[in-house]
UniProtKB/Swiss-Prot annotation:
Residues 6-150 form the Nudix hydrolase domain. It comes from the Bacteria. Belongs to the Nudix hydrolase family. RppH subfamily. GO terms for molecular function: mRNA 5'-diphosphatase activity. Gene3D superfamilies: Nucleoside Triphosphate Pyrophosphohydrolase. A motif (Nudix box) lies at residues 39-60. It holds the Pfam family NUDIX. GO terms for cellular component: cytoplasm. The lineage of its organism: Bacteria, Pseudomonadati, Pseudomonadota, Gammaproteobacteria, Cellvibrionales. This is RNA pyrophosphohydrolase.
Length: 170
């Protein structure tokens, strides 16, 4: 499902643990390409439905394993480099338009599983600090990551503050 401008609708997933760290995953393929989980929105599927489907396909988690904390307001777009555009495909896809979700992990991180019946997207993952991905993601996605992280940073900071309060009471 590609829009009239050539952008494929997509969801991006920023998953945070109770320490405020983000799940950062390495793509299969051996090029040391790390990113947040993401995936396309199918026809007749809402962004939230796509989020939960992709969450399970890519990292093995279910809706009950997470809580949605925030979502970007509009679509964030990036263009694919010319070498990655499939010029012989119709309709032509020139990039992605994404809704980004910030999720809190409610379950133990041992539930993260990268092999879920289909072709695995990732072969490794780790927890990283909130702004770490900006210096590591592939260049053509960097602006979208910056905009998503900036827009979702208030919700993330509020979660970190509530976690600190719980620990100090504990």
């Amino acid at each position: 499902m590609i829009d009239a401008d050539g952008f494929r609708p997509n969801v991006g997933i920023i998953l945070t643990n109770h320490q405020g760290q983000l799940l950062w995953a390495r793509r299969v393929g051996g090029q040391d390409a790390w990113q947040f989980p993401q995936g396309g929105i199918n026809a007749h599927e809402s962004p939230e439905q796509a989020l939960y489907r992709e969450l399970h396909e890519e990292v093995g988690l279910y809706p009950q394993d997470v809580e949605i904390l925030a979502c970007t307001r509009g679509w964030l777009r990036y263009r694919l480099p010319h070498r990655l555009v499939r010029h012989n495909s119709l309709p032509l896809c020139v990039g992605q338009k994404q809704k980004w979700f910030l999720l809190r992990l409610l379950s133990d991180d041992a539930r993260v599983c990268l092999e879920n019946g289909g072709r695995a997207e990732f072969d490794d993952w780790r927890w990283v600090s909130y702004w770490y991905p900006l210096g590591k993601v592939v260049a053509f996605k960097r602006d979208v990551y910056r905009r998503a992280l900036r827009e979702l940073s208030l919700a993330h900071a509020q979660l970190e503050n509530s976690n600190r309060k719980e620990l100090s009471r504990g």
